[in-house]
């Protein structure tokens, strides 16, 4: 998809703040600092539109990015950051569950994992959670440029096995640096949102 117009419409914490436009939505979820902002920036051909941060736990709201008035990317707060209080984590969990369990416009979720490491228990829980709500899932293994080509198949099978991916779940290896996987991610987004 050629992207020229992007706009951060709203940062929401409650359903009444979600956008009214009945556009399809794709959520992006993953651990803090897994590369959600880098994926968004790569997909929309911008360098720093979605703020990348060296400080984990920076995204604390559901950020709705309007893409060409055709769909929304919804950036979900990163999980697994230890310096966030238990109370704050519970608040985020409620906010995220409300969104995933009630949002009619949500067409699918991209779950990001760091391809250099085995997925964590929290990564596994996220996939289980998405399966529970019957949300189509694309798993994106990030930072693939840091893995030698000879070891990428091993990384891919490790992710599949640990996350217990079903035959309906797609897995794409991705690099924001080399743009590996960018077109495949867009193809998946277009297929589930029916936009192109």
UniProtKB/Swiss-Prot annotation:
Q: Which GO terms describe its cellular component?
A: cytosol
Annotated signal sequence range = none
Check the record and name the Pfam families matching this protein. MMR_HSR1
Q: Where does GTP bind?
A: 30-37, 57-61, 75-78, 142-145, 174-176
The UniProt record lists the keyword RNA-binding: no
Q: Which HAMAP family match?
A: GTPase_EngB
- Give the family this protein belongs to, as stated in its UniProt record: Belongs to the TRAFAC class TrmE-Era-EngA-EngB-Septin-like GTPase superfamily. EngB GTPase family.
**What name goes with this protein?**
Probable GTP-binding protein EngB
The species this protein belongs to is: Ligilactobacillus salivarius (strain UCC118)
- What gene, per UniProt, encodes this protein? engB
């Amino acid at each position: 998809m050629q992207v020229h117009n992007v706009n951060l419409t709203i940062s929401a914490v409650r359903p009444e703040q979600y956008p009214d436009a009945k556009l399809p939505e794709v959520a992006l979820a993953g651990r803090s600092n897994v590369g959600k902002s880098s994926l968004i920036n790569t997909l929309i051909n911008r360098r720093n539109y979605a703020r990348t941060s060296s400080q984990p736990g920076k995204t604390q709201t559901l950020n709705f990015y309007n893409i060409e008035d055709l769909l929304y990317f919804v950036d979900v707060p990163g999980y697994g950051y230890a310096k966030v209080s238990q109370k704050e984590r519970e608040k985020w969990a409620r906010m995220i569950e409300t969104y995933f369990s009630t949002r009619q416009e949500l067409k699918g979720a991209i779950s990001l994992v760091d391809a250099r490491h085995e997925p964590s228990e929290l990564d596994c829980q996220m996939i289980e959670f998405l399966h529970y709500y019957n949300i189509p899932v694309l798993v994106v293994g990030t930072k693939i440029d840091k893995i030698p080509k000879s070891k990428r198949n091993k990384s891919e099978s490790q992710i599949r096995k640990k996350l217990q991916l079903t035959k309906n779940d797609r897995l794409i290896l991705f690099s924001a640096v080399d743009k590996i996987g960018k077109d495949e991610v867009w193809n998946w987004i277009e297929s589930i949102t029916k936009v192109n």
